[in-house]
Amino acid sequence: MSTPASAAPAALVRVPAGTTAGTAVREAGYPSKGPDVVVVVRDAEGGLRDLSWVPDADVDVEPVAANTDDGRSVIRHSAAHVLAQAVQQEFPEAKLGIGPPIKDGFYYDFAVERPFTPEDLANLEKRMKKIVKGSQRFSRRVVDSLEEARAELANEPFKLELIDDKSGIDDPEIMEVGGNELTIYDNLDPRTGEKVWGDLCRGPHIPTTKHIPAFKLTRSSAAYWRGNQDNADLQRIYGTAWESAEAQEQHLELLAEAERRDHRKLGSELDLFSFPDELGSGLPVFHPRGGIIRTEMEDYSRKRHVEEGYEFVNTPHITKGHLYEVSGHLDWYRDGMFPAMHIDEELNEDGTVRKPGQDYYLKPMNCPMHNLIFRSRGRSYRELPLRLFEFGSVYRYEKSGVVHGLTRVRGMTQDDAHIYCTREQMRDELATTLQFVLGLLKDYGLDDFYLELSTKNPDKFVGDDAVWEEATATLAEVAESSGLNLVPDPGGAAFYGPKISVQVQDALGRTWQMSTIQLDFNLPERFDLEYTASDGTKKRPVMIHRALFGSIERFFGVLTEHYAGAFPAWLAPVQVVGIPVAETFADHLFDVVKRLKAAGVRAEVDASDDRMQKKIFNNTAQKVPFMLLAGARDVEAGAVSFRFRDGTQVNGVPVDDAVRIVTDWIGRRENASPTAELLQSGREG
């Protein structure tokens, strides 16, 4: 299941001076309806233009079809306008915020007297359908002056702010202003040409509302004006729009499946973790079953790190603030840290300070403490590369509005490593680290990757440009040599160095950022890290930051959704459950379970009072990979019958074979769910 693919770029079309782009496209024979209908064109500079655009001179343009990424984006932006028109018809007092297209959809923010209800969304959809059916024309109009724009939009305070801030806005989600002129898009009645509604917007838009063949409003939520919690409270409506009903249905099926796989829902249903209100937002607790999965994840990671030459360290959860002054975190990352704890102050009886206190912080990152371990004694080139590894707990102040289940938390455990090496070792160490990261992710069943290269943010970095350029070039070379697709992320690096991030696609085709590998020449300088080179001189090591899972919590959430809660048998909290056909046969299964437990398998017998079919139903719902059934024939033959998650079954398997099948499957760390077909093929093989 995946999002509909985009069409290939179209051949160029010549638009004569004085002719609309739409006329030239039609005369060139492009479709006038359907999912590949042309909705806008791309000019020679790469900008998107309305089909009503009339160039001053002959120009070649690229037709942009509805079933392309750009085409869908334009459809969604136009759908946002239709939504805003419907809202102001239904709620005349509503004030307009912004309404951009986003991935797979759009939203629009409104200042209204109360939150929107599901009934409101249903009514708004009906209004939108009438507007779409009315085939209103989108007409671009240049406003001659700021004064004229302010007068026309005098009742829209948020639009007035955008007009006043026009020159200082650099936000891709603000579609209202941009370029060298202010424009308003009017929706015109197709019969009379009269203006029905309008909005401040830089465009472009589809020719008419009829070019929105499929849309749906999905939800509403609270929002802040321009994303700042200090600004006005708004209400946001989200929707989706597509080039065809079929494409939208495919997307909605994907959303429904994603909802079924939501790790927050599965975490509760499978008794894996919870978020007690008493602890606070973004602070999960893992229950025994979730603890088993987490322990298995961590133990396998530890084993692989030992094999790769990593050494384990451990650091405290809090530190004096001075450490993060040295590292630069307090200068560049303070907003992401919890407030200081001022402690150790001692007072005299009269209240005067006898001993001043100090600021302590919960650590947001482990790297400064690992630097102290490196610096704790003299280091020789013979020790390098030195690979320090820790499951380190860190704490980051995420705003409550962005905290989301396990994938965005405030307290997390990182599988954090810092590698110290020479300049000569740097490239090979990066390449080895990347291959280790990719291999370990594959071991957990994630094998669809691409890489992202995050480069310097010119407004937020430490060090000099030459060092950054060298680090970036080295990372780019290593990433390109991996053979994976490399996508640029300009300005996305942390303040201390560029990074490669591994982007992983899950079973639904969604992309998650997982591992990061960051090259850093700056922190070794700030911490005065040195090693003795082979010629006896002191040199700075290169530092490589590397988190493979990103965080245990995030990785746990991603795996839960990737497997829809049906974890591979080697990770499953309960790997085998025995289900007797009747209580008479339970002892037979207890003997089998005893053998499995002795072999290290997490096995148990369902001794509840439920009937056999209910037990099968319950344990299937709990995603148990192996269910062993036993009736009279099984007991008589010294056998069991296998039942699997998918409902398939293999009867009469001798107990010795059954124990071997289960232990071999788990021992191989198979990530596929066992089935009758896989078991039979394995036995035959």
Curated annotation (Swiss-Prot):
InterPro entries: aa-tRNA-synt_IIb, aa-tRNA-synth_II, aa-tRNA-synth_II/BPL/LPL, Anticodon-bd, Anticodon-bd_dom_sf, TGS, Thr-tRNA-ligase_IIa, Thr/Ala-tRNA-synth_IIc_edit. Catalyzes the attachment of threonine to tRNA(Thr) in a two-step reaction: L-threonine is first activated by ATP to form Thr-AMP and then transferred to the acceptor end of tRNA(Thr). Also edits incorrectly charged L-seryl-tRNA(Thr). PROSITE patterns: AA_TRNA_LIGASE_II, TGS. Binds 1 zinc ion per subunit. One of its GO terms (molecular function) is threonine-tRNA ligase activity. Its cofactor is Zn(2+). It comes from Rhodococcus opacus (strain B4). Belongs to the class-II aminoacyl-tRNA synthetase family. The gene is thrS. Zn(2+) binds at residues 367, 418, 545. This is Threonine--tRNA ligase. Residues 1-65 form the TGS domain. CDD domains: ThrRS_anticodon, ThrRS_core. GO terms for cellular component: cytoplasm. The keyword Metal-binding applies. It catalyses: tRNA(Thr) + L-threonine + ATP = L-threonyl-tRNA(Thr) + AMP + diphosphate + H(+). Homodimer. GO terms for biological process: threonyl-tRNA aminoacylation. It is found in: Cytoplasm. Residues 262-568 are annotated as: Catalytic. Its EC number is 6.1.1.3. HAMAP family: Thr_tRNA_synth.
